[in-house]
From Swiss-Prot:
AMP binds at R34, K55, L56, V57, G83, Y84, P85, R86, Q90, R155, R166. InterPro entries: Adenyl_kin_sub, Adenylat/UMP-CMP_kin, Adenylat_kinase_CS, Adenylate_kinase_lid-dom, ADK_active_lid_dom_sf, P-loop_NTPase. It comes from Orientia tsutsugamushi (strain Boryong). SUPFAM superfamilies: Microbial and mitochondrial ADK, insert 'zinc finger' domain, P-loop containing nucleoside triphosphate hydrolases. The gene is adk. PANTHER family: NUCLEOTIDE KINASE. Transmembrane segments: none annotated. Consists of three domains, a large central CORE domain and two small peripheral domains, NMPbind and LID, which undergo movements during catalysis. The LID domain closes over the site of phosphoryl transfer upon ATP binding. Assembling and dissambling the active center during each catalytic cycle provides an effective means to prevent ATP hydrolysis. Some bacteria have evolved a zinc-coordinating structure that stabilizes the LID domain. It is an enzyme of class 2 (transferase). Residues 120-158 are annotated as: LID. It comes from the Bacteria. This is Adenylate kinase.
Length: 210
């Protein structure tokens, strides 16, 4: 099974994916794109330009990332695809290249909550694990839970002006996917304004794996 997580930045997709990682392989397109942005490849400058402007990275880049990631995961594995597809073109591409059944979870959240959450978001410089100053800090203050690094940073795309551009881009490009997947009876709406615990319970119940 594949669970596709779709929602605006700051809606909690990555947090839920991390909490479910014991039973799911995680493909976080945003995380992979940030890795590409820091590399010495021809695509790095292109990705950096789009992320810093708050726009969607071109589909020819994200599609290739997703296909390569899916090839590297065992066929028997359950998968969470976090942050993809982001428009109708990518949704069509995904269905053409996906050999497994999938469900789409749409994280619905108020813009004001998104802005508040993203202002407090930080990530580990070494492994990329995301934390939040408001509700999800490392268990030991200043030490990453995953790799024990003490180096943290604010993400370049979490600047407030960029956040607002990302939300505008999301509403224009990604929201139409609601009707696309509703028509296929694949869509489940998640109230992402709720607590992390309540959202996790709902996802576990509907996945049928727990």
């Amino acid at each position: 099974m594949i669970l596709v997580f779709i929602g605006p930045p700051g809606s909690g997709k990555g947090t839920q994916a991390s909490l479910l990682s014991e039973k799911f392989s995680i493909i976080s397109v945003g995380k992979v794109l940030r890795t590409v942005m820091e590399s010495n490849t021809a695509e790095a400058d292109v990705v950096k330009k789009f992320i810093k402007s708050g726009k969607l990275v071109p589909s020819n880049i994200t599609n290739k990332i997703v296909v390569n990631a899916l090839k590297n995961i065992e066929q028997c594995k359950s998968i969470i695809l976090d942050g993809y597809p982001r428009d109708i073109f990518q949704a069509d591409f995904l269905q053409e290249n996906l050999q497994m059944d999938f469900k789409v979870l749409f994280f619905d959240i108020d813009d004001a909550v998104v802005l508040r959450r993203l202002r407090g978001r930080i990530s580990c410089t070494d492994c990329g694990t995301i934390y939040n100053k408001l509700y999800c800090m490392p268990k030991i203050n200043g030490v990453c839970d995953i790799c024990n690094s003490s180096s943290f940073q604010n993400r370049v795309d979490d600047d407030e002006s960029i956040i607002k551009l990302r939300l505008e881009s999301y509403k224009k490009e990604t929201l139409p996917l609601l009707e696309f997947y509703k028509a296929q009876n694949k869509l489940t709406l998640i109230d992402a304004n709720q607590s992390t615990e309540n959202i996790l319970k709902k996802i576990k119940k509907m996945s049928g794996i727990y």
